[in-house]
Amino acid sequence: MKKISVIIPCFNATKYLPKCFMSLVQQTIGIDQIELIFVDDASTDGGATWNMLQEFERAYPESIIILKLEENMRQGGARNIALQYATGEYIAFVDADDFVADNFLLETYEKAKESDADIIQFEYFYYTDRLGAVDSGRNVTPEVIKISSVSERKKFLISEKVTYGCWNKLYRHDLLKKAHTSYAEHVIYEEPLFVYPLLYFADKIVILNDAYYYYRQNDAGTMRNDMKQEETLKMHADVQLAVWNFMKKTPFFQEYYDEIKLYFLHTYLYETLYFAKLRGFQPSYSFYKKLEKTVLAEVPDYAQSIYNALIPKQMELYRMIGEGMTEDDFKGYWERL
């Protein structure tokens, strides 16, 4: 068994893929200790991405698996397929336009083994070709989070110490098998459906302030452009609704209802609107009303929470829902958001 499987979804990726590849094969843990799974997500570059992946496989046939999808499934679908092939003790995810420090896998693996962690979360740099690496600006305190009771998990869940992105973490493979989580497919912002449920299954999470990952900031990036469109903004909400529906089927839903509700209402409604605001894009009133309709159907007690004091901005929105938000009300709220 390899120590770590690293999954890399690729779509028309030849511009940055070589740098990503070299950062992985030069890992100080040793190429023989890792399994790299590259997935060509139905690239449309005339076979250029696939040809490059074939070259990688020929160079390291014992450590590289390449998969070619006939249908574009976006990053979530590509990762789901790759997980079916992964054999490593731990799992990591790297995007094809990003790269990692050469000690990334060795240090995170050693810390995972030393602490018997289910999840290791680490820090990252932003990266552009013009500026190089830029500190993320996150102020993180290293911590070992042990969860052995319901009250401890509740406290952890509202602490927001763990982010919902997938690539700044190392995961115990057995944890993923136990949780049966998967990524949302054919959408952007696919990661929460995979990451959020894991927080209910993990019993030990290690937070590091060491940065190993270089997250490329690309103006042509999928997320940045797509979130300016109402159709793809809806994908964000749909993924959060999928998280809610997943959690309803778990044994955790009743015991952690307040925490799951807090997460769902924040991400499905408030965060969807806030993301649009950040991108200078105002969705239509009809778009908002569809979100509101789902909230009323799924969470009739949306305005009642033991955590109300923690979310004043969200509570303003919830109060306006209760009063019957008109189109003029929505425009006014948007200006204040």
Predicted feature residues:
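A conserved hydrophobic helix/loop-capping motif in glycosyltransferases and polysaccharide synthases
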Residues: 4-16, 20, 27, 39
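Acidic donor-binding segment of Leloir-type glycosyltransferases
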Residues: 21-68, 113
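Glycine-rich, basic loop-to-helix element that forms the pyrophosphate-binding segment
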Residues: 69-86, 96
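Short aromatic/hydrophobic "clamp" motif used to bind/position activated sugar donors
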Residues: 91
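Donor-binding/catalytic cores of nucleotide-activated saccharide
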Residues: 96-208, 215-231
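Membrane-interface aromatic/basic loop that binds lipid-linked glycans or pyrophosphate carriers
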Residues: 117, 276-337
